[in-house]
Amino acid sequence: MIAEDALDFLKIDVQGGELTTIENGRHCLASAVTIQIEVSFLPLYEKQPTFAEIDQVLRTLGFIPHTFAAINRRMIAPLFDERNPCAALNQLLEADMVYVRDFTQPQRMSDEQLKHLAIIAHHCYRSFDLATNCIFHLCQRQAIAANSMQGYAALAASVQTA
Protein backbone atom coordinates (compact mmCIF):
# COMPACT_ATOMS: atom_id res chain seq x y z
CA MET A 1 0.00 0.00 0.00
CA ILE A 2 1.32 3.43 -0.93
CA ALA A 3 1.15 6.03 1.83
CA GLU A 4 -1.27 8.85 1.02
CA ASP A 5 1.45 11.50 1.12
CA ALA A 6 4.06 9.49 -0.79
CA LEU A 7 2.95 10.08 -4.37
CA ASP A 8 3.92 13.19 -6.35
CA PHE A 9 3.79 11.93 -9.94
CA LEU A 10 1.77 9.14 -11.50
CA LYS A 11 1.93 7.83 -15.07
CA ILE A 12 -1.15 5.89 -16.17
CA ASP A 13 -1.10 3.81 -19.36
CA VAL A 14 -3.49 0.93 -18.82
CA GLN A 15 -5.18 0.38 -22.20
CA GLY A 16 -8.73 1.40 -21.36
CA GLY A 17 -8.65 0.98 -17.57
CA GLU A 18 -7.86 4.61 -16.77
CA LEU A 19 -11.06 5.45 -14.90
CA THR A 20 -10.88 2.26 -12.84
CA THR A 21 -7.28 3.06 -11.94
CA ILE A 22 -8.19 6.61 -10.92
CA GLU A 23 -11.25 5.53 -8.92
CA ASN A 24 -9.33 2.82 -7.06
CA GLY A 25 -6.39 5.11 -6.42
CA ARG A 26 -8.14 8.27 -5.23
CA HIS A 27 -6.50 8.07 -1.79
CA CYS A 28 -3.06 7.93 -3.44
CA LEU A 29 -3.82 10.97 -5.59
CA ALA A 30 -4.51 13.22 -2.59
CA SER A 31 -0.90 14.44 -2.50
CA ALA A 32 -0.07 13.97 -6.19
CA VAL A 33 0.75 17.08 -8.18
CA THR A 34 1.19 15.56 -11.66
CA ILE A 35 -0.54 12.80 -13.60
CA GLN A 36 0.60 11.77 -17.06
CA ILE A 37 -2.20 9.71 -18.58
CA GLU A 38 -2.83 8.15 -21.95
CA VAL A 39 -6.13 9.45 -23.33
CA SER A 40 -7.94 8.40 -26.49
CA PHE A 41 -9.84 10.67 -28.80
CA LEU A 42 -11.19 7.69 -30.76
CA PRO A 43 -12.08 4.39 -29.08
CA LEU A 44 -9.45 1.67 -29.46
CA TYR A 45 -10.75 -0.76 -26.82
CA GLU A 46 -14.17 -1.98 -25.79
CA LYS A 47 -15.72 0.25 -23.09
CA GLN A 48 -12.68 2.52 -23.17
CA PRO A 49 -13.27 5.89 -21.49
CA THR A 50 -13.06 8.93 -23.72
CA PHE A 51 -10.76 11.88 -23.24
CA ALA A 52 -13.79 13.89 -22.08
CA GLU A 53 -14.66 11.37 -19.36
CA ILE A 54 -11.11 11.22 -18.05
CA ASP A 55 -10.78 15.01 -18.19
CA GLN A 56 -13.99 15.47 -16.20
CA VAL A 57 -12.92 13.06 -13.44
CA LEU A 58 -9.43 14.55 -13.12
CA ARG A 59 -10.85 18.08 -12.95
CA THR A 60 -13.15 17.04 -10.09
CA LEU A 61 -10.03 15.81 -8.29
CA GLY A 62 -8.36 19.22 -8.66
CA PHE A 63 -6.21 18.60 -11.75
CA ILE A 64 -6.13 20.61 -14.97
CA PRO A 65 -4.58 19.82 -18.36
CA HIS A 66 -1.10 21.29 -18.72
CA THR A 67 0.59 19.89 -21.82
CA PHE A 68 0.87 16.96 -24.18
CA ALA A 69 3.84 14.69 -23.56
CA ALA A 70 3.09 12.82 -26.81
CA ILE A 71 0.41 12.93 -29.51
CA ASN A 72 -0.47 10.08 -31.87
CA ARG A 73 -2.37 10.77 -35.08
CA ARG A 74 -3.67 8.54 -37.86
CA MET A 75 -5.05 8.87 -41.36
CA ILE A 76 -8.80 8.63 -41.79
CA ALA A 77 -9.99 5.75 -44.00
CA PRO A 78 -10.23 5.23 -46.89
CA LEU A 79 -6.92 7.11 -47.18
CA PHE A 80 -4.14 4.63 -46.44
CA ASP A 81 -0.39 4.39 -47.01
CA GLU A 82 0.63 0.76 -47.55
CA ARG A 83 4.29 1.63 -46.94
CA ASN A 84 3.47 3.13 -43.57
CA PRO A 85 0.14 1.91 -42.11
CA CYS A 86 0.54 4.17 -39.07
CA ALA A 87 1.16 7.29 -41.16
CA ALA A 88 -0.62 10.30 -39.79
CA LEU A 89 -2.22 13.43 -41.09
CA ASN A 90 -4.36 15.39 -38.63
CA GLN A 91 -6.80 13.01 -36.93
CA LEU A 92 -6.01 12.76 -33.23
CA LEU A 93 -5.97 9.16 -32.06
CA GLU A 94 -4.46 9.24 -28.57
CA ALA A 95 -2.10 11.29 -26.47
CA ASP A 96 -0.12 11.27 -23.27
CA MET A 97 -1.71 14.20 -21.50
CA VAL A 98 -0.08 15.85 -18.52
CA TYR A 99 -2.42 17.04 -15.79
CA VAL A 100 -1.20 19.13 -12.86
CA ARG A 101 -2.75 20.35 -9.64
CA ASP A 102 -4.72 23.48 -10.43
CA PHE A 103 -1.99 26.11 -10.07
CA THR A 104 -4.61 28.88 -10.34
CA GLN A 105 -5.63 27.78 -6.83
CA PRO A 106 -2.22 27.74 -5.09
CA GLN A 107 -3.83 28.04 -1.65
CA ARG A 108 -5.03 24.45 -2.13
CA MET A 109 -1.43 23.19 -2.34
CA SER A 110 1.04 22.77 0.48
CA ASP A 111 4.54 24.20 0.27
CA GLU A 112 5.85 20.69 -0.39
CA GLN A 113 3.37 20.15 -3.22
CA LEU A 114 4.41 23.44 -4.84
CA LYS A 115 8.08 22.47 -4.52
CA HIS A 116 7.48 19.05 -6.04
CA LEU A 117 5.37 20.50 -8.85
CA ALA A 118 8.16 22.98 -9.66
CA ILE A 119 10.74 20.17 -9.81
CA ILE A 120 8.55 17.93 -11.98
CA ALA A 121 7.56 20.80 -14.28
CA HIS A 122 11.19 21.79 -14.78
CA HIS A 123 12.88 18.40 -15.09
CA CYS A 124 10.19 16.24 -16.73
CA TYR A 125 8.45 18.68 -19.06
CA ARG A 126 10.66 21.76 -19.42
CA SER A 127 7.66 23.76 -18.23
CA PHE A 128 9.67 26.69 -16.99
CA ASP A 129 6.60 28.91 -16.76
CA LEU A 130 4.83 26.50 -14.41
CA ALA A 131 7.97 26.04 -12.32
CA THR A 132 8.30 29.83 -12.09
CA ASN A 133 4.67 30.11 -11.01
CA CYS A 134 5.29 27.63 -8.19
CA ILE A 135 8.46 29.43 -7.11
CA PHE A 136 6.59 32.75 -7.12
CA HIS A 137 3.97 31.39 -4.72
CA LEU A 138 6.62 29.80 -2.51
CA CYS A 139 8.39 33.18 -2.30
CA GLN A 140 5.09 34.88 -1.46
CA ARG A 141 4.65 32.40 1.39
CA GLN A 142 8.25 32.95 2.50
CA ALA A 143 8.76 29.19 2.17
CA ILE A 144 11.95 29.70 0.14
CA ALA A 145 14.54 32.46 -0.17
CA ALA A 146 13.22 35.76 -1.49
CA ASN A 147 15.77 35.79 -4.34
CA SER A 148 14.73 32.36 -5.63
CA MET A 149 12.81 33.87 -8.56
CA GLN A 150 15.95 35.56 -9.90
CA GLY A 151 18.03 32.45 -9.39
CA TYR A 152 15.52 30.26 -11.15
CA ALA A 153 15.12 32.71 -14.05
CA ALA A 154 18.88 32.49 -14.66
CA LEU A 155 18.81 28.69 -14.45
CA ALA A 156 15.83 28.39 -16.81
CA ALA A 157 17.46 30.75 -19.30
CA SER A 158 20.66 28.69 -19.29
CA VAL A 159 18.71 25.44 -19.81
CA GLN A 160 16.65 26.92 -22.65
CA THR A 161 19.76 28.01 -24.54
CA ALA A 162 21.67 24.75 -23.95
Task: Please annotate each region the language model reported.
Residues 1-3:
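Short amphipathic alpha-helix with an adjacent loop that forms part of the alpha/beta core around
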Residues 5-129, 134, 138-139:
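Conserved acidic-Pro-Pro-aromatic motif
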Residues 133-162:
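Short, charge-rich amphipathic alpha-helical segments embedded
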